[in-house]
């Protein structure tokens, strides 16, 4: 994929027919937020509400993410939120490798255009794709990794916390560390 502008990338994503998911999507869920964000949050794929609205993390999981952002004094307007997949898999199943491969260049271009200081993977699927293939979310959440020009970490996916609320304190601690890392990176500029 050639380097694109925001508008070109958005149009390319909206017209994408790179995998079977394009046939069943209501909307391409490109991403939302500050295009100059210091933090990029990356989930795995849109859910039903996201497919209907074309905006990531607007359902119950997104509302929970908003609460965590608020709790650590990070405004949603100051971050960018995207997914690895831009189209919803049927019945919210895990993305297939071929689907990830079809979409990953869109995310790479988003990263290139945003130039975030921190990339936060929301859940194991995003972490396995972006940090390392054998990533174990239960053991490695909140751990920092350096990849290229970015520092990266992963937290539990908000949807997982809705299913298992026992992890909510760990999520809050991870989000506090993200805020602390962001503040330290801003201080070093």
Where are these regions (language model features)?
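A polyanion-binding, active-site-adjacent surface
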Residues: 1-189
